[in-house]
Regions:
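Active-site hotspot residues in diverse enzymes, especially metal/ion-binding acidic/histidine motifs
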Residues: 1-169
Length: 169
């Protein structure tokens, strides 16, 4: 499935000439809304009467909103049939126990972080947290990207999986 996800991300980037999730959401005619009354809910994706919607908590930091947009776009591309039954809600974005959440995280990491950016960090012998600062995303998303790159043959050694509850703090 990981190869399918990477292929889907690459197809979108090629077709629309961007990796910006907001631009892709617009190009794909998905309705994007922000709301301030979501509490701890980061965002959600749903389908209603054949219309697709992404809702993002606008109390999040700008970079986190970008991440949620990429994550929810992943649900659109990978899990539309699930969203027709019930909205896909994201309280804990980096949940490793749910297959749909895991796949949406892989999608977001592949969309938002370029292989070349990680490769440059590795070449410059940056440590993990320096790498996260350079690419501009939280360590958990970077870990998803690193796992994907490892599976594609990059010489990366990771000691552990992401903590699924870090956003609850």
């Amino acid at each position: 499935m990981q190869n399918y996800i990477i292929g889907e991300v690459e197809r979108l980037k090629r077709k629309y000439g961007t990796s910006n999730p907001y631009e892709l959401i617009d190009a794909l005619n998905i309705h994007l809304m922000t709301r301030s009354d979501l509490g701890t809910l980061k965002g959600f994706y749903y389908v209603s009467f054949r219309e697709r919607y992404i809702v993002i908590n606008d109390n999040l930091h700008e970079r986190d909103m970008l991440l949620v947009a990429g994550h929810e776009l992943g649900h659109d591309r990978l899990h539309q049939r699930l969203a027709k039954v019930a909205p896909l809600k994201d309280f804990m974005l980096y949940d490793m126990t749910s297959r749909a959440e895991y796949e949406a995280n892989v999608f977001a990491s592949e969309l938002l972080i370029e292989d070349e950016a990680i490769a440059e960090c590795i070449e410059e012998e940056m440590d993990y947290f320096q790498m996260c600062r350079v690419v501009g995303f939280k360590p958990q998303l970077v870990t998803f990207k690193l796992y994907g790159m490892m599976q594609r043959g990059y010489p990366i050694n990771l000691p552990e999986t992401p903590n699924s509850s870090f956003l609850n703090k």
